[in-house]
Structures are given as C-alpha cells and as structure tokens.
Amino acid sequence: MSVIDKTSSAVNPLREKVTTACAKKLYNDKDCIKIADFITPLVEDMNLDSNVDRKLHNKLERYELRLNKEYLSEFEKINNIVQKFDELCVKMNSTCTNLSKQMETVKFKSVDLVQKTASLKEKKASIESRCNMINEFLENYSLSSEELRELDECEQSGHLSEFFFKVLERCHEIRENCRNMVQEQGHLAAFEVMEKMQKIDERSHAIICNNLKREFQNLTVDSHQKKQILSKAFKIISQNDAVFQLAIDQYISSRSQELLNQFVEINKMAVQMPEGLAEPLKAVGDMLTSIHELTEQEKQLFSSICSAENLPIVLDECLKSLTSPFKIRVEQLLSTEKNAITIFKMGNILIFYANKFETLIRKDSYFTIMLADLVKTVRQVCIAGINHHVDGLMRKMTSPHYDLLPVPEVRQCLSLYHGLISIAVKTGDLNLLLEPERIYEYVLEPLIQTVQLSATRLKSDIEVSVFTINCLTVIRSAISEISAFKKKIEMIDAMIEGNSDVLVSVQVSEMLEKSGILELYQKFNAVNPAEKKPLSTLPGLESTTVGEAIVMFTQYLHNHASSDHTYDIDQQILASEERQRIRERNTLEFLKVYKMIVDRLGNPTNGYENLHYLPIEHVESVLKFEKEKENTPSSNESESLA
C-alpha cells in the first residue's frame, strides 16, 4: 500500500474512506458484504472467508492504487482545466468589470432611451389615434373606390343606375355633414371634403344632364323603372336651378318631338280609314280627343317624375309643338266644309276642348290660345256660311203660292235655324260659337224681312196678311221654346196682331156688307148724338128700310150657319189657334156692330116698336155653334199642314 501523506488525505476525503474500509474486517461488516456481493462478479472462484481476506485486501490495495493513479491522472486533467478555468475567470472578471462599466454606461443610455421610447410611444399613440380618426373620417366622409368607379362607368356608358343615385345621396349626405362641421367646429378637412363633394356633385349633375335626353326617349306611363330613375334624378338636380332648368328643357324638347310623332301617326291612321277626311267634324273631334288623351298621359308621366309646380309650364311647352300642325289641319278641313251647321258644331267642339285644356294645362297656354284663335276663325267662317246660305235662300224665294202657305225657302231657312238652335239647346249653359240671339239675328231677321218683302207681291191686303201671318206663325213656333227669345216672340206677336187687325177689319166689313147691315150701321153711326128726332123719321132709317135690312141679315145668318166656310179667306191660315183667334175676333166685332144696331132698335124713342129682330144672344149662339162645328176639322187640317 503506497504511502499517502496526510496532507493528501486531508485534501482527498475519498482516499480516507478507502483507507478506513481496508482497515476493517470486511467479512464481519454488513456494508462490506454488500459491497463484496457487488464486486463478487469481478473475482472468479473466490469465496469470502477469513482465508482470503489478505488476498482480497491486497487486491483491493492494488485496485486502489490503480484507481489513485487514474484519479491522479484525471485530477491533473481537472487541475489543468481548473487552471484554465481560473485564467478564464480572471479574464471573465476583467471582461465583467468592463461589461459592468459598459452596462453602467448603457444603463444611463437605456434610461434616456426608455424616456425617449415612452415619449415616442405617447407620440405613436397620438399618431395612431389621429390616424384612426383620419381613417374613420375618410371612411365616413369620402366615397369608396367602388362608388367612384360607378360614377366613371355611368359617365362612360351613358346609363343611370340605382347605385348611381345611392352614390349621389351619400355624396349629398357627406357634404351636408361637412358643412355642419365647418360651421360648428371650423373643421378645415371637412371644408376640403365639402369642396371635393361639391365637385363630385357638379360632375354627377353633368352626367345626369348628358344622359337624361336618352332616358326621356321612348318614355311611357308603363316605364316604371325609368320613371323611378328619372324621379330620383330630378330630385337631385332640383337643388341646382341651372341644371334643373336644363333638364326641364331637355324633357320638353324630347317629349315635344315624341308627342308630335304620335300626333302624326294618329293622323296617318285617320287618313287611312275608309271615311278619311270626308267627315271634318269627326276628324276634328278625333284629333282633339287624341291630343287630350296624350296630354293626360303626359301629365301623369311628368307628375310621377317631377314636382307638380312645374307641371303647367312643362305641359304647355310640350303641347306647343302640336299647335301649328293641328291649326293647319283644322283650317284645311274648314276650307272644304260648306255646311254651316257642321261648322257650328266644329266651333262648339273647339270651345268645349278649349275649356277642358284650360283646366288640364293652364288658362293662357299656347294650345288654348291657338284654340281661341281657331274659334274666332271658325266663328267668322260660320257666320259667313250662314249669311251665304240665308242670302242664297232669300234670293231664290219666289212669290207666295195660291195657298198662301210658307214657300219652300222659308222651310229651308227654318231648317237651318233648327239645326243651329238645337245644337245650342243641347249644349246648355256652356260657351257657344254663336249665342241664340246671334242665330236669330243671322237667320230669322233676314227671313222676316224677306217674307214681308215677298208678301208685297200679292194683290190684296188680305192675301198679304194671311201669307205674313202663316210665315210669322211658323217662325214663332220655331223660337217659342227658347226663353231668351221672349222679346222676339213679343215682337212677332205684335206683327201677327197687326196683320190680324187688317184681316179682321176686311172680313168684318165683308160680313157686314153681305149681311146687309153695313149701310144701316154706317147711317146709325153717322147720326149726330144731339139729334132729338126719332131715328125712324130720318131718311134711309125708316122702319121699312130697317126691316128689310133685318130680314136680309136673318137670311145671311141662316146661310152663313149652314155654310162649310171652305172658301173663307181665314181657312188659309196655317195655325188653327191663330185661325180660331181671328174668327173669334171677327165674331166679337160683328156682334159689337149688331149690338149697336139692336140698341138703336130697342130704344123706344127711335120709333121701331113693331120691328122684329133676332136677339143678340141668339146671334151669338149661332156664331158660337159655327165655331164649335168647325173647330175639329180645322185642327186636323192645321196639324196636316204643320
């Protein structure tokens, strides 16, 4: 066993443990036995007993020595490593010292850097906040790329879409919000955005104006999608007066041409129909009906896309294109029409539609003014036609016929009057081309004058009166239903009354002469009321003379009662009522004369006591019986003549 100095043992505790283990009796030590069991595999055929203790001890010493050598070798290596490590530690110490100094330096720098970093973080947070605010502002107060692209596409394609108007609504919303921000906060960015939105708005207005004319073409009441787009377009551009007026002008131009084309097509179809333009009245009515329908459609169409306050002006301007073609067409039709009644109807149609268009458009529109001018023209043509027709009839009027009835020209003139006045009656209280008074003035006044002039060709006053009464009676019957002609009827009645006076005077004189009492009446009437002598003593009024006259009167009355009066002049009077009135007047006047004679005969002072004469009541009853007997056949005859 090698000698190991105490210093080494003290230094190496492992060696001390090995030495202690070798000094013990290993076979009695339980721990050693465990170790022996552990190292037994290392020794072949060796049993742990007292005999082998020495051998084992030697072997262990050798093993220990070898281990010590190995330990020494390894320890030298470790020592070398430790020495190197020590050198490294020295170097590391130096390095750490340097690092410590540098760290102190860096520490001061880091503190400054941290302070700067904190400041930068604050600035970064502020910048990020501002950036977020800017991004949020730009997001809320600017148009997206898609929206800007939509504006470009609409500008290039020329078609407006729903999305286009959504973009414009957003543009207006942004501009209004920016305006509020500028007014309330003085926001400069909002002012710039507002100016930008203003430019976009102006650009969009230009796009709308450039595309409206295309949208207006082929626009109908059923074009619902187009109407929605145009309604939004007008709503947007209404804020810009100049652009809005330009759009209105474009609408008027486009729709005027469209209305003109439709009007031309309607006229082409009317010309191609079998009757063509052979019926001017129907042609004018159809044209006005078509124009009224087109105007109604145009009114409905414009009301659906724009405000109603511009409607009258727009309709007026749109219909302006139809005024000249319609006026020319009506004047052409008017130039070919000669019938005054048809012209009168045409004028009333024009007046009727003029009133309708005043309500539909406005009072002083181009179309209503044109219709008013046409009405004046038609009125002049109608008056000229009536005058020409009446003058022609008056020139052709022949002398009265033997029956003293109205000549055919009178009937034709009254037919013209009936045609005109019936239209006036049907029209009622509406405006007329000619009022009933004017119709009377242009038709019946010349007729009455010509009738009076034509009657002068007759030989006797009775024939003149009968013919005049017949004509005036027919005229009065024609105007009797018109309340406006009350004074005219009174005037005609006065003229009939005047001619009836002549007729009654002549007839009564003739009856008195035929009855034989005319001379007696004249003599009685010629006696001076102051005469005191009896009338029977006067020459020509003797009882015998008066008696003969009374007998002659009685015979006349008998013959008169039995006569059918076929050849009486009053039988030629057309109207049974007038004829009966004249007969009643004849009877009344005749009875007045006879009553005066009877009064003279019945006066005792006149000396006619023994003279027999018919009582007045008897004569009156005989004459009334005649009247009743003739009433029925006369009425039938009057109806047949009428």
From Swiss-Prot:
It is found in: Golgi apparatus membrane. It comes from the Eukaryota. It is a peripheral membrane protein. Its main location: Golgi. One of its GO terms (cellular component) is Golgi transport complex. The keyword Protein transport applies. The keyword Signal does not apply. InterPro entries: COG6 (IPR010490), COG6_C (IPR048369), COG6_N (IPR048368). One of its GO terms (biological process) is intra-Golgi vesicle-mediated transport. Keywords: Golgi apparatus, Membrane, Protein transport, Transport. SMART domains: COG6. Belongs to the COG6 family. PANTHER family: COMPONENT OF OLIGOMERIC GOLGI COMPLEX 6 (PTHR21506), CONSERVED OLIGOMERIC GOLGI COMPLEX SUBUNIT 6 (PTHR21506:SF0). Component of the conserved oligomeric Golgi complex which is composed of eight different subunits and is required for normal Golgi morphology and localization. Required for normal Golgi function. This is Conserved oligomeric Golgi complex subunit 6. It comes from Caenorhabditis elegans.
